């Protein structure tokens, strides 16, 4: 993976974890060997287009996300064990990760606010992701 793509993946991971100030945490995540394969695996598994994956990596707003976009996010959440194989959010793991990226009280508030349930795992994952993305400025 080129350094540019790895940098984009790191940016995406930071976005995925609410753009919090723990830059060193994103660097640490990018060094985990499994992370490097997640993007390619999740692109293939979800059927997302390269342009949509790029929008997610860049933190762009996606007005009408299709199922492939939602399932791409769900794939990452599943790989990071933030959701189990049935799409159930693993609250303890979400809190643990958020706690590494921000103050504990902010982590709890964000986890509560973004503990959203939808009709299927892909919709749930995307709703959570979008909540984190929308609330990042309020938590910095």
From Swiss-Prot:
GO MF term set: odorant binding
Entry annotated with the keyword Membrane: no
Signal sequence, renumbered to the chain: 1-25
SMART domains registered for this protein in UniProt: PhBP
Keyword tRNA-binding annotated: no
Compartmental location: Secreted
Phenotype on disruption: (Microbial infection) RNAi-mediated knockdown results in increased probing initiation time.
BP-aspect Gene Ontology terms: sensory perception of smell
Keyword terms of this UniProt record: Behavior, Secreted, Signal
Pfam families for this protein: PBP_GOBP
Biological function: Involved in modulation of blood-feeding behavior and capacity in female mosquitoes. Required for normal oviposition. Required for normal fecundity and fertility of female mosquitoes. Required for normal expression of VGA1 gene, which encodes the egg yolk protein vitellogenin-A1. Required for normal female longevity when mosquitoes are maintained on regular sugar meal. (Microbial infection) Facilitates shedding of dengue virus type 2 particles into mosquito saliva. Does not affect dengue virus type 2 replication or infection prevalence in midgut and salivary glands at 14 days after blood feeding.
Name of protein: Odorant-binding protein 10
Source species of the chain: Aedes aegypti (Yellowfever mosquito)
């Amino acid at each position: 993976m080129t350094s540019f793509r790895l940098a984009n993946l790191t940016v995406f991971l930071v976005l995925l974890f609410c753009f919090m100030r723990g830059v060193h945490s994103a660097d640490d995540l990018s060094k985990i060997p499994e992370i490097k394969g997640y993007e390619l695996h999740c692109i293939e598994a979800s059927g997302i287009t390269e342009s949509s994956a790029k929008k997610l990596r860049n933190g762009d707003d996606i007005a009408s996300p299709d199922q492939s976009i939602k399932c791409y996010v769900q794939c990452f959440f599943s790989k990071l064990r933030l959701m189990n194989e049935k799409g159930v959010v693993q609250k303890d793991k979400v809190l643990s990760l958020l706690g590494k990226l921000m103050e504990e009280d902010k982590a709890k508030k964000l986890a509560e606010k973004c503990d959203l349930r939808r009709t299927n795992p892909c919709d749930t994952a995307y709703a959570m992701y979008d909540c984190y993305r929308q609330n990042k400025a309020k938590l910095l």
